Amino acid sequence: MAILIPERFAHEMTDVIRLIPEDEYERGYCTCLDTISEAEINSLCWRAIESIDKKTIRQFLGSKYCNIDPDYWYNKLVELSTIPNHPFNADYFHALMMRFTMPKRDGRFQFFFNGCAGYDDNRCANPLRRLIDWAWSENVSVKADPESTRLAAVMLCWLLSSTYIKHRDEATKALVNLLSEQVEVLIETLR
């Protein structure tokens, strides 16, 4: 439903939340809100780009109805980061990061960068780890399209600010591998 409602009817799934009477909100609708929140955020990976209402999603994220942990949202942004023309790709993440002063940015994101560039308890790669592994894979610089490469590079460049040396080193090596055959993208990324 989180995919069909926006694509067929041009409404976000979060519009359903408005149907919950305000006085009923506290009576056990938290589970419903959790489900709707997760469905809305997870649908961003699968929906047609033109069906995503960026303004509505951003308003929802800042509302009392959103039950999404910030790290969950940041992980989703990493997953979306390499999709060209997606409203929440690496260009969005870059603009989000640039709004903060360096101390606020470091205070807010260092734990995310340091904790989310590895593996979870089940040994599944977190989104940043998957991005590093992909950018570090053989022949990726030849195979990847220039726009996805640029977006991946923008995202990986933010990992260079990590206080964790291992992640900084891996991001550096992944960037070198990713951009080795795409000099134009390297120059554009540095601008």
Please annotate each region the language model reported:
Residues 89, 141-146, 177-187:
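Flexible loop/turn segments at the boundaries of HEAT repeats in alpha-solenoid HEAT proteins
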Residues 64, 80, 99-100, 155-160, ...:
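Alpha-solenoid HEAT/Armadillo-like helical repeat scaffolds in large eukaryotic proteins
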Residues 55, 95, 150-158, 188-189:
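Alpha-helical solenoid scaffolds in eukaryotic proteins
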Residues 2-135:
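Long, acidic/serine-threonine-rich intrinsically disordered regions with weak helical/coil propensity
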Residues 1-5, 10, 155-156, 186-191:
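Long alpha-helical HEAT/HEAT-like repeat alpha-solenoid scaffolds in very large eukaryotic proteins
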